[in-house]
């Protein structure tokens, strides 16, 4: 629903939306009808092994090389991870998606992390490694600022907290719903990667203002954070 509402707000037309079982491993029967449609974009809202398998099937069916009304047919993966890209192999070439962070960023914080991680492990860090690194620093900083390890004090220190220096520019932990907002990286599978860690390239940075939504947005409203439980 989020993909449909966002794209239709920009003037796109949704030809079809198909749900697939989580346990599916062969997506051929779902991909084949796309060939007969007038669609010029396929959004594969899959993750992990499902994304690897569905993208592989889509490329095998020739969708990556298809032309629709003299335009290149595009396949989009909403969120990439290194393991997903590595699992799909050459099938990610030319495929657009997004990611939270990438080791090629040139801000000082990213470069320092890439250098220290690479020195210890011998290869550049993944998005997952970066997330773990940042969350550890944020927790330690919140405890220090709150002067306590009490979960309620830590939560209070993080609510509405804005920080910088971790890549992708300034980041906000919104107090109302504890969601994290920052610039989003649009990436594409590299045509000629130099290694298994060089599969994606940044093609655009979408400003945070374009991806921020209101806490009472219909797709996310209705929940409650409740009251803090200090764990006692």
Per-range role (PLM):
Residues 1-232:
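Extracytosolic ligand-binding ectodomains
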